[in-house]
C-alpha cells in the first residue's frame, strides 16, 4: 500500500479548497469493510482504499452490520466544497457469498438506480447504475481480499443509498432512463470542489508552470479516460497535463494571452459535442447537447432523412453516435473539426496549434484532428 495516505474528506494540497470523494469511492471503501468483516468478523475502521491515480484516502464507517452469511458497512459521503446533491448520503454495501463460479455480481439496493435505456455507461438495461470504474475498483479490491484468504471471489455486492430515490429527482437520472435512485459514479474517486474561480485559477497555474519549464505541448482533458487515451499517444510529463475538466474556456482564454505552442484537448463524445456547439463550460448543469445540432452534423455526413426523428428523440449523445455508427456514418470526425473551430475562435489568433481527440467511454479514439 502507498505510504502516503490522505485522510478522507481532506484536500492534501489546499486546505482552503476541500475535495470530496465520489459515490464510487465510498461504495468501494464500504465494500472492502463489509467483505473483510464477512471473512474475519471484524470491521476495519477507518478503511483505506487505493484510488485509480494512487491516492489512499481513509473513510470512517457510519454503519456496521454482521449477520448469518452477510455483512454490511456504510459510509457518509462528503463532497467537500462541491455542491453535490449526494453530499451527506450514506452509501451502504451489503456483501454475501454467491454460488461457486459466479464471480462478482452487482445489484442495486434501495436508492440506487437501475438502467432502463441504452446509450449509457452501463450498456445493458436492467443493470444496476453502478458505473464501470466503481465496478472495477470494487472487483479488484474484493479479488485481492479473497486471494489473501485463499477464497474464491464469488460474491453478490448490493449497493444501497437510503433516500437515494428522492435525491435522484434532483439529477438527470430520470431523464436518462435511470430509475429508482442515484448512480454510483466516479472515474478518479475524487470530487473536485465546484468553485469556478479556484478551478480556473488552478488551470492558469498549470499553464504558468508548463511555460516556465519550457514545455511546448500541453494536454487538457475532460476526464481520466480521455486523458489516458491522449497520454498513451504522447506520455507528456505531469506538469504538461492541465486540470481542465469542464472548463475548456478557462484553458483557451488563458492560452490566448499566455500561449504554448501546442494544445491537445481530449474528451468524450458528448463533452466535445458541446464544445463543437460553441460552449466553453462543458458541465451538464450549464450546457446541454443539442440533438438538432447533431442531426445537422449527421445529415451532412450522409445520414438518411428517416434517421432525423430517431436522433432528435435520442436519450443521449452516445445513443446518437451509436445510431450513426450502425449505418456506417462518422459524426465523431466532424464533431472534432467543429470543436477545433470553437477552440481556434476562442484563441483569437494566438500562436497555439490545436488538436482535438474524441474518445468513447472505454478510451478508444473515435476522431483525432
Swiss-Prot record:
<dbReference type="GO" id="GO:0043780">
    <property type="term" value="F:cobalt-precorrin-5B C1-methyltransferase activity"/>
</dbReference>
<keyword id="KW-0489">Methyltransferase</keyword>
<dbReference type="Pfam" id="PF01888">
    <property type="entry name" value="CbiD"/>
</dbReference>
<dbReference type="GO" id="GO:0032259">
    <property type="term" value="P:methylation"/>
</dbReference>
<dbReference type="InterPro" id="IPR002748">
    <property type="entry name" value="CbiD"/>
</dbReference>
<keyword id="KW-0949">S-adenosyl-L-methionine</keyword>
<dbReference type="InterPro" id="IPR036074">
    <property type="entry name" value="CbiD_sf"/>
</dbReference>
<keyword id="KW-0169">Cobalamin biosynthesis</keyword>
<comment type="pathway">
    <text>Cofactor biosynthesis; adenosylcobalamin biosynthesis; cob(II)yrinate a,c-diamide from sirohydrochlorin (anaerobic route): step 6/10.</text>
</comment>
<keyword id="KW-0808">Transferase</keyword>
<protein>
    <recommendedName>
        <fullName>Cobalt-precorrin-5B C(1)-methyltransferase</fullName>
        <ecNumber>2.1.1.195</ecNumber>
    </recommendedName>
</protein>
<comment type="similarity">
    <text>Belongs to the CbiD family.</text>
</comment>
<dbReference type="GO" id="GO:0019251">
    <property type="term" value="P:anaerobic cobalamin biosynthetic process"/>
</dbReference>
Amino acid at each position: 500500500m502507498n505510504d502516503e495516505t490522505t485522510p478522507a474528506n481532506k484536500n492534501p494540497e489546499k486546505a482552503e479548497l476541500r475535495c470530496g470523494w465520489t459515490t464510487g469511492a465510498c461504495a468501494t471503501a464500504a465494500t472492502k469493510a463489509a467483505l473483510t468483516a464477512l471473512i474475519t468478523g471484524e470491521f476495519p475502521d477507518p478503511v483505506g482504499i487505493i484510488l485509480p491515480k494512487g491516492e489512499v484516502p481513509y473513510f470512517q464507517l457510519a454503519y456496521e452490520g454482521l449477520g448469518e452469511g452477510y455483512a454490511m458497512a456504510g459510509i457518509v459521503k462528503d463532497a467537500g466544497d462541491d455542491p453535490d446533491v449526494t453530499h451527506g448520503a450514506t452509501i451502504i454495501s451489503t456483501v454475501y457469498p454467491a454460488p461457486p463460479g459466479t464471480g462478482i455480481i452487482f445489484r442495486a439496493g434501495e436508492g440506487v438506480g437501475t438502467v432502463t435505456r441504452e446509450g449509457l455507461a452501463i450498456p445493458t438495461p436492467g443493470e444496476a447504475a453502478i458505473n464501470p470504474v466503481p465496478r472495477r475498483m470494487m472487483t479488484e479490491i474484493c479479488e485481492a481480499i479473497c486471494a489473501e484468504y485463499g477464497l474464491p471471489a464469488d460474491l453478490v455486492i448490493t449497493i444501497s443509498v437510503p433516500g437515494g430515490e428522492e435525491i435522484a429527482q434532483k439529477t438527470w437520472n430520470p431523464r436518462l432512463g435511470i430509475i429508482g435512485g442515484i448512480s454510483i459514479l466516479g472515474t478518479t474517486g475524487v470530487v473536485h470542489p465546484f468553485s469556478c474561480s479556484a478551478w480556473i485559477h488552478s488551470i492558469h497555474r498549470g499553464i504558468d508552470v508548463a511555460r516556465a519549464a519550457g514545455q511546448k505541448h500541453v494536454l487538457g482533458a475532460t476526464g481520466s479516460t480521455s486523458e489516458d487515451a491522449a497520454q498513451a499517444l504522447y506520455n507528456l510529463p505531469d506538469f504538461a497535463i492541465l486540470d481542465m475538466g469542464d472548463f475548456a474556456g478557462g484553458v483557451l482564454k488563458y492560452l490566448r494571452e499566455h500561449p504554448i505552442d501546442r494544445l491537445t484537448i481530449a474528451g468524450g463524445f458528448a463533452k466535445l459535442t458541446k464544445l463543437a456547439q460553441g460552449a466553453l463550460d462543458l458541465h451538464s448543469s450549464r450546457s446541454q447537447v443539442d440533438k438538432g445540432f447533431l442531426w445537422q452534423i449527421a445529415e451532412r455526413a450522409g445520414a438518411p432523412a428517416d434517421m432525423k426523428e430517431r436522433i432528435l428523440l435520442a436519450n443521449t449523445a452516445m445513443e446518437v453516435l451509436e445510431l450513426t455508427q450502425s449505418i456506417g456514418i462518422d459524426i465523431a470526425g466532424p464533431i472534432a473539426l467543429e470543436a477545433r473551430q470553437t477552440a481556434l475562435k476562442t484563441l483569437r489568433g494566438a500562436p497555439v496549434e490545436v488538436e482535438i481527440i474524441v474518445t468513447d467511454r472505454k478510451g478508444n479514439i473515435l476522431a483525432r484532428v
